[in-house]
């Protein structure tokens, strides 16, 4: 049985952006549905075949900038490549 990793990525901060790297061998069970506490801009930094999915929506390729809205359940779906994204939390409005 796989023990879920609550942080299945490496994270650094650069120029006010959160940089997250998900390994090509990440376990799919670690990529759980969740809702963020803040609205965020997510920008992929590498060519990849990963997907992004919001609740009650079909998955979309994670190949362009996304707006992830606070409180909306979502997940990423593992591809075969490494995934590197930069994330900016937006101020509450």
Model-derived regions: residue spans:
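Ligand-binding loop in jelly-roll beta-barrel domains
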Residues: 69-93
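Short, conserved beta-strand element in jelly-roll/cupin
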Residues: 35-50
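Short acidic-glycine-tyrosine-enriched beta hairpin
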Residues: 53-73
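Conserved short histidine dyad/triad with adjacent acidic residue
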Residues: 17-36, 67-71
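Short, surface-exposed beta-strand-loop junctions and turns on beta-sheet-rich folds
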Residues: 50, 57-60, 82-83, 91
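Domain-scale activation on soluble regions of proteins
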Residues: 2-9, 65-69
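Double-stranded beta-helix
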Residues: 3, 8, 16, 21, ...
